[in-house]
């Protein structure tokens, strides 16, 4: 999957860019 390496806080996958998912630590990855 394509995920830009940008540190973004998230509460769900929809908060993240491209194909990033919301990880357990509260950030996209």
Curated annotation (Swiss-Prot):
Alphabetized, the UniProt keywords read:
Disulfide bond, Knottin, Protease inhibitor, Secreted, Serine protease inhibitor
The UniProt record lists the keyword NAD: no
| A GO CC term attached to the entry | extracellular region
Q: Where in the cell is it found?
A: Secreted
Q: Does the keyword Disulfide bond apply?
A: yes
* Pfam families xref list: Squash (PF00299)
Q: Which GO terms describe its molecular function?
A: serine-type endopeptidase inhibitor activity
UniProt cross-references to InterPro entries, sorted A to Z: Prot_inh_squash (IPR000737), Proteinase_amylase_inhib_sf (IPR011052)
Q: List the disulfide bonds.
A: 3-20, 10-22, 16-28
Q: Which PROSITE patterns match?
A: SQUASH_INHIBITOR
Checking SMART domains in the record gives: PTI
Gene3D superfamilies in the record? 4.10.75.20
Q: Where does the entry annotate site (Reactive bond)?
A: 5-6
Q: What is known of its domains?
A: The presence of a 'disulfide through disulfide knot' structurally defines this protein as a knottin.
Q: What does this protein do?
A: Inhibits trypsin.
The UniProt similarity line reads: Belongs to the protease inhibitor I7 (squash-type serine protease inhibitor) family.
Q: What is this protein called?
A: Trypsin inhibitor 3
Species for this entry: Luffa aegyptiaca (Sponge gourd)
